[in-house]
């Protein structure tokens, strides 16, 4: 679901990137050091902040107003706050590019809206790797249901 959404957004972006009258906004999220907030976090480190740096340069050349959230600032609360703020800035005809360079993880679908029985989720820096009944049940993950 998230992959499809990203592909659609990228295709739309490519098709209209040279439109001169439209306002262009980008929100980029990148996490490299998943241990920065919690040394016991079991997620492997990746190169998300490098992706954000490279994509920021490209998008600014295309006239985008770029907001980036990286490392310890890439918490669930902050990502959702920035997404909400973005929805207030855009207007009809705006181009919006969303980019997430972080881990993803499937979650059992609880509301029955997924054919395959799984919700997809983004993994912010404050989300543990393991589901533990009564301790951590995915509350910091950002599921596709939340993004829809």
Specify the residue positions occupied by each region the protein language model found.
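Bacterial N-terminal signal peptides
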Residues: 7-15
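Positively charged n-region of N-terminal signal peptides that target proteins for export
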Residues: 1-5
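Caspase-like (clan CD) cysteine peptidase catalytic core
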Residues: 21, 76-101, 106-148
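Short beta->alpha junction loops
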Residues: 68-76
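Hydrophobic anchor at the start of a short beta-strand
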Residues: 65-67, 96
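Cleaved targeting-peptide boundary
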Residues: 20-28
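Short helix-loop-beta junction
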Residues: 50-65
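Glycine- and acidic-residue-enriched helix-capping/strand-helix junction motifs
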Residues: 35-53
């Amino acid at each position: 679901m998230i992959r499809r959404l990203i592909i659609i957004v990228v295709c739309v972006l490519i098709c209209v990137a040279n439109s001169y009258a439209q306002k262009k906004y980008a929100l980029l999220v990148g996490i490299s050091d998943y241990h920065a907030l919690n040394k016991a976090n079991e997620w492997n480190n990746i190169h998300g902040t490098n992706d954000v740096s490279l994509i920021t340069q490209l998008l600014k050349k295309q006239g985008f107003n770029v907001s980036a959230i990286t490392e310890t600032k890439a918490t669930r609360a902050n990502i959702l706050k920035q997404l909400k703020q973005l929805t207030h800035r855009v207007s009809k005809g705006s181009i919006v590019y969303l980019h997430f360079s972080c881990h993803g993880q499937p979650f059992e679908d609880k509301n029955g809206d997924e054919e395959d029985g799984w919700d997809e989720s983004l993994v912010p820096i404050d989300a543990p790797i393991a589901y533990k009944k009564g301790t951590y049940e995915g509350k910091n993950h950002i599921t596709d249901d939340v993004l829809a």
